[in-house]
Each structure stands twice: as structure tokens, then as C-alpha cells.
A protein has these predicted regions:
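The feature marks the mature, well-folded catalytic cores of soluble enzymes
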Residues: 1-298
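Helix N-cap / loop-to-helix initiation motif
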Residues: 84, 311, 369-370
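Accessory "access/gating" subregions that flank catalytic or transport cores
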Residues: 309-312, 319
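Short Cys/His-rich zinc-binding micro-motifs
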Residues: 305
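Intrinsic disorder at enzyme termini
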Residues: 1-25, 29, 39, 394-456
Length: 456
């Protein structure tokens, strides 16, 4: 009854030293988040307010998108609409081609990962340089992000040091000191900023009232990516729009506290129009399924997500299986839900990667009911034709047993004889539970018989 996730997680757990480090690292981030949350008396009120803002905006998204686009055009920005990933990539390429761009630097954007923009542009002969350090590391390594906020968290400083030596970024063999490696990365990226023809940013928020794009970073790379190049392209999903700066103030107090346990991001950059050094600014608003998801009565609230990553940091399954165990490019609880919205046939294996502990709901800054939604997805697997046939057979059997008192009493009366089954048989492939658990001993008397004796 293994799923694609459980098979990948099994591979991840083969290196127990690394698996323990991965678990402890994310729990430390969760602890920092808790300390920050407990330091604000109004934390729960902020969560409720943030949830209300996102709910209101998404249920009135057509109005706010129109307001945003109108304001952006008044600011002198060219606004584009992309219905899907293919159109988004074509729009980006068209803009770059019109400006004779050969090299583009960009800050971190999960939207461009979603649309497969980098490989598309590279196939057209345009060099794309990731400038977020974590993203740059995995770009050089040819990997995808394993976390939406800390994309290279699965690599340690020795991995990065060896990579930098291989790519010629580091010139001191064996020096894997993080401070030194960061310094060498800065030197390497500095030339890219100065020689790029275009800069691209994502956007944490789009302000409908003013047409502004707001980007939060800890490295200042969004500012650097838009300071020297003469062209700035900003790309955001439709759900990133919020009404005004009063609403932004709520999210700015929560985003970094929830995601990394910091009071705020080091840099919060506001882009209303092309910077003095740039000649042109374009904003691309991307649908790629979002307008359809809004109509999903049970799961549309996943669009409230502000991509802080806190649900991953706390999730016991993500912490112990890693980001690459999931089939969707966003892992963890939010990735399970978004992946199912995207393609339930392709990503249904991820819904098993949840204990339903609901810790994700406890920490989510916008009060997303992630665990409840995952439970609902599980109930729908048969409708999608992806329910596990073995589980279906077992459930039918259990339904028969629990639906008949005589069958139930007969079964519980025989249960203790399972204690005498030889261990190799009990732990064989027919019993997947035994792969990760020690089988319990069955009592001689079932609970309902013990209760009867006690009540005499």
C-alpha cells in the first residue's frame, strides 16, 4: 500500500544522521516562530484579521484585480494577463526579446517555478541567474527547491563548499566556512547584477489601491536585481492582491515571524513604477488555474496562503521525509492541497503524507484549515479513481466486521492468537504496518469483555 511519497520518504530516511538533522533544524525554526508569536499579545487577533482580509479579497478578486491593474497603468507600468503557464512564459520571452535581453537576474519566485520559466527561457537562449543565495545554490546544482522559503536547506556547508569549488566560485579548496562561502557568492553575483540586461522579481503582495508590488527579502537581492538593469519584470499570482497598505501592515507583522522566526524581513521593497535607473517596468498577473480553484467550494481557501512556509516547519511528516518526497513542486501541507487542486490524479499520493495532527493549522498566520482539507481530499480519492485498491478492500472488510456484532465478537476472540504467529510472517510484505512499527501484543480479553467484568 505504499504511495509515491512513502517510497521517497523511505529513501530519505536511509541516512538517519541527515534525517535527524533535518527534523531538528525545522523544529528549531518552529520554536523561533513560537517565541515571536508569544511576544505579541495581539498575535491571534492578527491571525484572525489576516484571514478575514484574504477571505474578503479572494471572494471579491475581480474587483481588486481591476483596481490594481488600473492603478498600475496610471503609474506608467505595462500590465499583462497570463491565463496559464505557457502564456506566462511566452509573455516574459516576448518582453525580453523586444528589449534584446540576453541575460536576466531574478529574485526568488515560486510562481516561476510553477510555470517552468527558467528552462523555457534557457531553451530560447536567454541566461537566467537566480540571485537569492539558496536559489542560486540549487540552480548551480541542477535541483528544485526543497522548501519554499529555504530552498537549499537540504544541503549543508560541505555540500555548498564542494559545489562552489566545482563551479569556480570558491578559490580556496577545502574552505567550507559559511561566512567565506557567502562572501564568495556575493563576489560572483555582483558581476551578474552589473551586467544583466533585465531584472525580474516575484511579489509577496500586490496593493490594489496603488498598483504597488511589495517584495520581502533577507538579502536585498530584489533591490539589486532592479537597480542596474534597464528593464524590470514583476510576476505575481492573482491571489497575491490585497486591498491597501493598511492590510499590508497586518501581513508584514506576521510573514517573517511565522516563516523564519524573525521580527521582520531585512528588506521590504516597494515597486510602484520603473526605478530611475530602469526605463521600463512590466507586471504580469498570472491565473494558471487560480480562477477555477476559487470555484471549488471545499478547497478554495488554499488561495489564502502567503507562502511563509510555517506549515512545513511544523509538519512531522515533512520534517522527517524532506521536500523531495512530494510529487508537487511545493511540499508540505500547503503543497498537498495545492497539488490536488492542480492535478488530483497526479498528486493524490501526497495526501497520505499527513498524520492529521493539525499542527499546520495551529501555526498558519492566515488560519488555513490545511489538515481538514487534506482529510476532505482523502474522502474524494475514490471519485478521482486514485483510491488504493488494497485499502478499499480492507475498509470494506472492516465495515463488515464493525457492522456485525457477531463478526466483531468472533474476530476479537481470535485476535490474541496472532501473538503466536512467527515474527517473519507477521513482519512480511503483507503487513505494511510492521515496516515502520513494532507490532503490539493483543490482549487475551477484548476491552468490551473487561468492561463487563468491571461493571459486575
Amino acid at each position: 500500500m505504499s504511495t509515491s511519497h512513502s517510497k521517497a520518504a523511505k529513501q530519505f530516511l536511509k541516512d538517519q544522521t541527515y534525517a535527524h538533522w533535518h527534523d531538528a533544524t525545522f523544529w528549531a525554526v518552529r520554536t523561533k516562530r513560537d517565541n515571536m508569536a508569544h511576544g505579541l499579545d495581539e498575535w491571534e487577533q492578527l491571525r484572525e484579521k489576516a484571514s478575514q482580509i484574504k477571505r474578503h479579497t479572494i471572494t471579491h478578486l475581480d474587483e481588486y484585480l481591476d483596481q490594481f491593474a488600473t492603478a498600475a497603468v496610471k503609474n506608467g507600468v505595462e500590465v499583462h494577463w497570463a491565463k496559464d503557464a505557457q502564456e506566462f512564459n511566452e509573455i516574459v520571452y516576448g518582453i525580453l526579446k523586444n528589449h534584446n535581453v540576453k541575460k536576466m537576474v531574478k529574485s526568488k519566485s515560486m510562481l516561476t517555478e510553477e510555470c517552468g520559466m527558467n528552462p523555457y527561457l534557457e531553451s530560447k537562449g536567454i541566461e537566467v541567474i537566480e540571485t537569492d543565495l539558496g536559489e542560486r545554490i540549487i540552480q548551480l546544482k541542477g535541483q528544485a527547491p526543497s522548501h519554499i522559503v529555504m530552498p537549499a536547506i537540504h544541503l549543508n556547508h560541505d555540500d555548498v563548499g564542494e559545489l562552489f569549488e566545482e563551479k569556480g566560485i570558491s578559490n580556496e579548496k577545502g574552505n567550507h566556512d559559511p561566512t567565506y562561502l557567502t562572501y564568495r557568492a556575493r563576489l560572483s553575483l555582483r558581476n551578474e547584477f552589473l551586467t544583466a540586461d533585465a531584472g525580474m522579481t516575484g511579489g509577496n503582495f500586490g496593493i490594489a489601491e496603488t498598483g504597488d508590488i511589495v517584495v520581502c527579502t533577507n538579502e536585498g537581492n530584489a533591490d539589486m536585481s532592479t537597480s542596474c538593469p534597464k528593464l524590470h519584470i514583476a510576476a505575481i499570482g492573482l491571489e497575491k492582491i490585497i486591498p491597501n497598505y493598511e492590510c499590508l501592515a497586518v501581513f508584514q507583522r506576521m510573514l517573517c515571524r511565522a516563516g523564519t522566526g524573525q521580527p521582520t524581513t531585512t528588506y521590504t521593497s516597494h515597486f510602484r513604477k520603473a526605478r530611475p535607473t530602469a526605463h521600463h517596468m512590466h507586471i504580469i498577473l498570472v491565473d494558471n488555474g487560480r480562477s477555477e480553484w476559487i470555484g471549488n467550494g471545499e478547497h478554495w481557501e488554499s488561495l489564502k496562503c502567503i507562502r511563509c512556509g510555517s506549515c512545513m516547519n511544523t509538519c512531522p511528516v515533512y520534517r522527517r521525509s524532506g521536500g523531495y518526497s512530494y510529487s508537487y513542486f511545493i511540499p508540505g501541507p500547503i503543497g498537498i492541497n495545492l497539488g490536488m487542486l492542480r492535478d488530483p490524479q497526479k498528486h493524490s499520493g501526497n495526501v497520505s503524507a499527513c498524520t492529521l495532527c493539525l499542527s499546520c493549522q495551529t501555526v498558519c498566520p492566515v488560519k488555513l484549515n490545511l489538515g481538514d482539507q487534506i482529510y476532505q481530499w482523502r474522502q474524494q480519492l475514490d471519485d478521482f479513481g486514485t483510491a488504493n485498491p488494497q485499502k478499499k478492500l480492507m475498509c470494506k472488510g472492516m465495515s463488515m466486521v464493525y457492522g456485525s456484532s457477531s463478526l466483531y465478537n468472533f474476530g476479537t476472540g481470535l485476535a490474541h492468537w496472532a501473538n503466536f504467529i512467527p515474527s517473519p510472517l507477521m513482519n512480511c510484505g503483507l503487513n505494511p504496518w510492521a515496516e515502520g512499527h513494532k507490532m503490539m501484543e493483543f490482549p487475551k480479553k477484548p476491552f468490551h469483555e473487561l468492561i463487563k467484568e468491571i461493571e459486575k
